[in-house]
Swiss-Prot record:
Induction: Expressed in the early phase of the viral replicative cycle. Keywords: DNA condensation, DNA-binding, Early protein, Host cytoplasm. InterPro entries: Poxvirus_I3_ssDNA-bd. The gene is OPG079. It comes from Monkeypox virus. This is Protein OPG079. Plays an essential role in viral DNA replication. Binds to ssDNA with high affinity and localizes to cytoplasmic factories where nascent viral genomes accumulate. May disrupt loops, hairpins and other secondary structures present on ssDNA to reduce and eliminate pausing of viral DNA polymerase at specific sites during elongation. GO terms for molecular function: single-stranded DNA binding. GO terms for biological process: chromosome condensation.
């Protein structure tokens, strides 16, 4: 087992937002814009349609003609501090795990999706009758929680382990959930797709499903070095020997009980 010590790299401050501002339609749109690296127009319009579930509306995205002609998908890429958690009370269910991403960068698709959805609600267009009573001014918006997006729809997703100068390793996430949940928080990219627009009274959010997680294949631990500084120590020797699965420190918050008094993701849809 190699232990290659890497000094922590200082990064520029990430955009921040107050909890109150992230719970307004205007606030969440502005925050999504602040973490977008581009303002290139991607979305022509969004339509919300009634579904078999009273509280859920399906989401139909129409991309701009130039993107549609290139057969571009409506997937959204995010980057941020990522951690996979267990739901202790749901180990026998498909949502026994969920992903928390503290987003530091996002595709412009994200803010344009939010902008289009709440623009529709404001103008009472391209929405089902069940949403006509909503006012964008009084909505409590829950897509972000603590500047993070929570994703519990993981079925069918892939995980790609990457390492500089070496071939990446692609696997189905189903076989990686246990080992990923034992990793510490680390920077990763995620490709997600919107699932439904969820409403409960005046609380709303867009829910997402994970399509792909792109993560450094090294398992690292944050330790306090001899000088008192925080250092990141590589704990992985060879992914092909499955050390990526079997090594890693269990984070203190590794298991998350939705029935406990802890804060939890809202709208498990």
């Amino acid at each position: 087992m190699s232990k290659v010590i890497k000094k922590r790299v200082e990064t520029s401050p990430r955009p921040t937002a107050s909890s109150d501002s992230l719970q307004t339609c205007a606030g969440v749109i502005e925050y999504a814009k602040s973490i977008s690296k581009s303002n290139a127009k991607c979305i022509e319009c969004v339509t919300l349609n009634a579904s078999q579930y009273a509280n859920c509306s399906s989401i139909s995205i129409k991309l701009t003609d130039s993107l549609s002609s290139q057969m571009t998908s409506t997937f959204i890429m995010l980057e941020g501090e990522t951690k996979l958690y267990k739901n202790k009370s749901k180990q026998d269910r498909s949502d026994g795990y969920f992903l928390k991403i503290k987003v530091t960068a996002a595709s412009p698709m994200l803010y344009q999706l939010l902008e289009a959805v709440y623009g529709n609600i404001t103008h009472k267009e391209r929405i089902p009758n069940s949403l006509h009573s909503l006012s964008a001014e009084t909505i409590t918006e829950k897509t972000f929680k603590d500047e993070s997006i929570f994703i519990n729809k993981l079925n069918g997703a892939m995980v790609e382990y990457v390492s500089t100068g070496e071939s990446s390793i692609l696997r189905s996430i189903e076989g990686e959930l246990e080992s990923l949940s034992k990793r510490e928080r680390q920077l990763a990219k995620a490709i997600i797709t919107p699932v439904v627009f969820y409403r409960s009274g005046t609380e709303t959010k867009i829910t997402f499903a994970l399509k792909k997680l792109i993560i450094d294949r090294e398992v690292v631990a944050n330790v306090i070095g001899l000088s008192g500084d925080s250092e990141r120590v590589s704990m992985t020797e060879n992914v092909e020997e499955d050390l990526v699965r079997n090594l890693g420190l269990v984070d203190i918050d590794d298991e998350y009980d939705e029935d406990s008094d802890k804060e939890k993701p809202i709208f498990n849809v």
